[in-house]
Amino acid sequence: MAPDLAMKPKGCWRPSLAKGTIKKKIFLGEKMTEYKNIIVTGGAGFIGSNFVHYVYNNHPDVHVTVLDKLTYAGNRANIEEILGDRVELVVGDIADAELVDKLAAKADAIVHYAAESHNDNSLNDPSPFIHTNFIGTYTLLEAARKYDIRFHHVSTDEVYGDLPLREDLPGHGEGPGEKFTAETKYNPSSPYSSTKAASDLIVKAWVRSFGVKATISNCSNNYGPYQHIEKFIPRQITNILSGIKPKLYGEGKNVRDWIHTNDHSTGVWAILTKGRIGETYLIGADGEKNNKEVLELILEKMGQPKDAYDRVTDRAGHDLRYAIDSTKLREELGWEPQFTNFESGLEETIKWYTDHQDWWKAEKEAVEANYAKTQEVLK
């Protein structure tokens, strides 16, 4: 029987159980560590709020404290309907040592999602990325160290840089070194990815130097409900819904390894409860697609011509290809992705943004105006 991954009844997405979309419930093995009081940083953002909903729906004995600064990418509405006895929201900065100390004293685990994550924003102003991604992570680690509590750090595959396209590789993307693994050397290429790499490294150092009970996960590109409309998939969907032509960087050959955010949630839970301290696990669902392919699929699903988009100037230092090898997570912890049909997941995501225009419409004009400062339509 498939697990109940339902979100809130209004303003939330209930994933389809259509054939080929969701597999059977994942097996996490026999020995799991139970946590009763967890802090989820960034739990009002896209990936973090989906994790909070996952815990709320699947682990009724767990109390969640969401610590979120509620910047433009955090939204109280993402968790509004589950706030109560089991989920509380604390509005604050993860770099506020006094606040973090107060919360950590009552917790037995921290799941650290909070991050500044938009590459374009990091190129315009790197300072918030240093503050949140590095100083914030340090502050949380010190609290975990003080109270000897479990710490899981949620990171990105972008810390590894990028890979050549499959057609340019001897193993066509499946050979040794042709996907990211936990052994891949760090090679970040943007202010965003460099601050995430730095935060990964201090987690590793705090494990080795101070015995902090920490793990790290590096995940590929997420999609699903609650993603801010500055991001690639929701931006294209909301452009079409707003009568604006979608925008494609350059030739659109850049490849991303897509994973549904609910699969990310189950992966993080598996690592939190069963992962080996000090280990890094990569979370991916074998979802490699180039940006042009994804955009054309969105256009097709929304009844538009496949060429009804504008090409714009490419992002500086735009990484070419990401690809995750999640063998370690699958074999060691028994995790498997449930959303294996990208088209079905994309259809559900399109439906969510179509049905919840009140969630994103107020921000649409400002988001496009911000992009217009740096993007020029190519002829």
Regions found by a protein language model. Give the residues of each.
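Generic recognition of short, well-ordered alpha-helical segments
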Residues: 50, 77, 102, 121-124, ...
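N-terminal Rossmann-like NAD(P)+-binding domain of SDR-like oxidoreductases, especially those catalyzing
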Residues: 25-222, 352-356, 362, 366-379
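NAD(P)-dependent short-chain dehydrogenase/reductase
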Residues: 78, 163-179, 191, 201-273, ...
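Residue-level signature of the cytosolic catalytic core of signaling kinases
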Residues: 75, 83, 225-229, 287, ...
